[in-house]
Amino acid sequence: MSATPVAILKTGLVTSVGLSAPSTCAALRAKLTNPSETRFIDSSGEWIMAHQVTLDKPWRGLTKLLKMAAMVIEEALSGVARKEWPHIPLLLCVAEPERPGRLDGLEDQLFLDIQTELGAQFSPQSAIVAHGRVGVAVAMAQARVLLGQGKITRVLIAATDSLVSWPTLSHYEREDRLLTPSNSNGFMPGEGAGALLVGTDTGTAGELLCTGIGFAREAAHLDSCEPLRAEGLSQAIKAALSDAGLEMHHMDFCITDLSGEQYYFKEAALALSRTLRERKEEFDLWHPGECTGEQGAVAGAAVIAMADAACRKAFTKGSNILAHMANDAGQRAALSLQFRGAT
């Protein structure tokens, strides 16, 4: 292992199937889903369906993002005294710059609005992580660096995102990427927020650890004309496993950000075939997006929170978990997660 593991101390989630991490993860385990009609109609005259988060008021845009973010941050920090919050860096994950229909204010206004909503300040080491679906993995790498400096013991990673807006939906509808009655090769848009309070590994039993992080770039990304061989994702997986001092056959199952498109399922299958060199009886592939829809930057937080809940409640296939995420533009990320059970 080339770096100190990062411990997942507490999680928070807001999704279309639950307004907290426990309720969302229970729904994910039961494979519940809650799509609803949006205000928008596609080119065939059908209502566009989405996994929408229902809050106290019908907030939209930046306001809804900050309300959801505030909820998950409060959940993840529920055991931390308010006076300690200013010493905790907040790494806020948002949509990537190239996202169609991306809201203005994600790099500056959103962070300030969240602090105002919470009535709190976070550490000057806080940062915006605008990397979409791979953002939480990028933030995890940044958190590991911050924790490794020895001056802080906790970092808060939060993500908030929504694909439920007309500029975004109309783009994906024109590209035939939305799941509709006439298109099975698509995703259902979603929204939500997630938070992970992470800290230094103290050897405490019953904690999920991030022991390896890997990144790469896929040349044959979704919009390219190159044949898909999953080279980028395979490289990211190998890097994460090498970082953790593990091999693919040590992993018990995989949790990913897959949300419905055949391209990404094919990529995941190819990456598994390229990295798994010893036969295993089974190797399950979990994907929370089947219940929550495509959540963009929130996907990584949902993946890790699901892994954490599954380990703590002992309904996993084992304690070694591979997680991986992918952006449309080619960025790939993988994490090695290991649960230290009670002795």
Question: Where are the regions that the model predicts?
Answer:
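Conserved "HGTGT" condensation-loop signature of ketosynthase/thiolase-family condensing enzymes
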Residues: M1-A141, V145-K151, T160, V164, ...
